[in-house]
């Protein structure tokens, strides 16, 4: 079931907060933007989260990938917010191969990769999308009971920095000439190539996860929800929509989304968002 008029928030953390709580971000004082590095704030601990509700209902709960809802105190971190396991990063972005943040070059610190409540160096050098995919497939394949489960896979691509294995970016370089204009024009062209490759890498990894669900016999009893937290930060990546990430034009908030996998979405039909005359 494709949701072709699905709206998120203009920035990462507000969208994640809404997904985790079912509340508008302004009700949690998180409407203004992303929770940046070293910020003494996070998703309010007095508000019950989706994984907490599911765990109360008997689900096992797992987070793979990006958290980005605060880590200034252990009470704000995933393991304290309803997840039984966490494998990923706490903050907004890091190098897709080294897990180091941009602050590393200024402060001599900034490594961001966690297994539950401890720093881990697993998967050193592995591209982030493949790293999160492997962990998700492992969780799917390791399920050996009738206990229902919830996995939030929060991929760090296609967020900057723009990095991807060459076999993906080469798809979009073929037959295209590198521009010879200004430094900004060349950079925008290169970033566009890389970002397209990053999305293709995501597509491949999501496909492998879906195959793992089918192979394990869990696909038809699993509700899969795909969403994005905001529009592209590059305006040309949102065409024909106006605007970009951080703006309330449709280019910043209207994002891809679909639901699949469960009997709930079989035999669906398309409805038009238009008005009848």
Describe the predicted segments one by one.
Residues 1-277:
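Formylglycine-dependent sulfatase
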């Amino acid at each position: 079931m494709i949701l072709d008029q699905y709206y998120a928030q203009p920035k990462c953390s507000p969208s994640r907060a809404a997904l985790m709580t079912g509340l508008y971000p302004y009700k949690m004082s998180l409407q203004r933007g992303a929770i940046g590095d070293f910020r003494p704030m996070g998703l309010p601990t007095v508000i019950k989260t989706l994984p907490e509700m599911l765990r109360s209902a008997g689900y096992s709960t797992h987070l793979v990938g990006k958290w980005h809802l605060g880590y200034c105190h252990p009470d704000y971190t995933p393991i304290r917010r309803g997840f039984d396991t966490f494998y990923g990063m706490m903050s907004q972005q890091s190098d897709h191969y080294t897990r180091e943040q941009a602050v590393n070059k200024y402060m001599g610190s900034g490594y961001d990769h966690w297994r539950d409540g401890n720093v881990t160096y697993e998967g050193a050098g592995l591209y982030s999308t493949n790293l999160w995919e492997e962990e998700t497939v492992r969780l799917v394949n390791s399920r050996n009971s009738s206990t229902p489960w919830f996995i939030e896979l929060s991929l760090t691509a296609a967020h900057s920095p723009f990095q991807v294995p060459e076999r993906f970016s080469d798809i979009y370089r073929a037959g295209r000439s590198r521009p010879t204009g200004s430094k900004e024009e060349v950079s925008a062209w290169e970033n566009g190539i890389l970002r397209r490759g990053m999305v293709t890498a995501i597509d491949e990894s999501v496909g492998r996860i879906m195959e793992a669900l089918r192979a394990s016999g869990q696909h038809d009893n699993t509700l899969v929800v795909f969403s994005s937290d905001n529009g592209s930060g590059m305006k040309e990546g949102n065409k024909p929509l106006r605007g970009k990430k951080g703006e309330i034009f449709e280019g910043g908030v209207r994002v891809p989304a679909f639901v699949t996998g469960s009997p709930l979405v079989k035999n669906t039909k398309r409805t038009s968002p238009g008005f009848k005359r």
